Amino acid sequence: MCIRDRFHYCPGCNHGIIHRLVAEVIDEMKLDGKVIGVAPVGCSVFAYDYFNCDMYEAAHGRAPAVATGIKRSVGKDTLVFTYQGDGDLASIGTAEIVHAAHRGEKITTIFVNNAIYGMTGGQMAPTTLIGQKATTCPAGRSEEWSGLPIKMCEMLAAVPSSYYIERVAVNNTANIAKAKKAIAKAFRLQMEGKGFTMIEVLSTCPTNWGLSPVEAMNWLEQNMIPYYPLGVYKDKEAK
């Protein structure tokens, strides 16, 4: 499912790992020919170059709305997923993701959170941590001026119609294995017609963080995971 080609992502970027996990799950579920992905504006805008399935490119933040129309058209036998960054989903796309969850749309969102705007040069994102530096907050994010970083899993878990919400990371082999398991469960629940599912993946952006790939992995573990705890935030199947 993942086309073997060189990724355009920066060295140390985790998009390649996440792409591989999504592709492996699709292959293992034997969904070839039954998958449609939606990628909006962001570093992953060229995802259609890497996934060997039908892919749509949505306007900035609008992937859940596009995915809703696709899923309602093609029906339950086709897996429909969105692949979105935090600058997309948690900023310009908050209306679309919140209402898709409220409607209980039977789609899956892969939400990549690297706490910064990557494609546009490292500006502060809604997920940027307090004190974290960005081009639009060179002294570090201030709670007084910008509020606290948004927590999408916690927000969408409170939505009555969401079905399965989990936050994972890909900073080490153990967490990568857990991330794959979470993606597989989200896809399975969608194919069973259960409801809205979202997997948030904590990721690095070495280029815009100004760190080496190894330093970025350590920074994620020491700073992002304490603020964005990993785990299942909602699982109606477990009830």
Set out the residue ranges of the language-model regions:
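Residues immediately within or flanking Cys/His clusters that coordinate Zn2+
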Residues: 7-10
